[in-house]
Amino acid sequence: MAKKSTGAAEGEAKAPAVAAVAPVAKSSSKKKVESGILYVQSTYNNTMCLLTDASGNALASSSAGALGFKGAKKGTPFAAAKVGDVLATKGQLFGLKEVAVVIKGVGSGRESAVRSFITKGINILSVKDVTPVPHNGPRPPRARRV
């Protein structure tokens, strides 16, 4: 039984068909946003911030862990200030002038993240605290004795 020939010599490989790819047009500039909403979630272990436009579409986000802080250092006010500093810089790239702040959580970085926005020159319109408070739910964890 002889092998059937496929048309190409045995040592040759067929050249793949190359499709013409149109270059993707990049937007020349980011969208300009005058006012936005800053969500700050501060826990005992970390501080996370989200910057959105007025309708709630996310523009930028950051956290203490994303900036390289590890372990117990993530929950410090210094780490939260750095998170706010990074987001304020990103917000200025979008042309952000004023934010409404929504704070959630009981961590130590609640205020220092917001203060870094003030030092960058971004106006604070309002501060809203939406920390969930139980109506006598489950028993809370015991207080630490240090």
Language-model regions: role of each:
Residues 2-146:
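Ribosome-associated RNA-binding proteins
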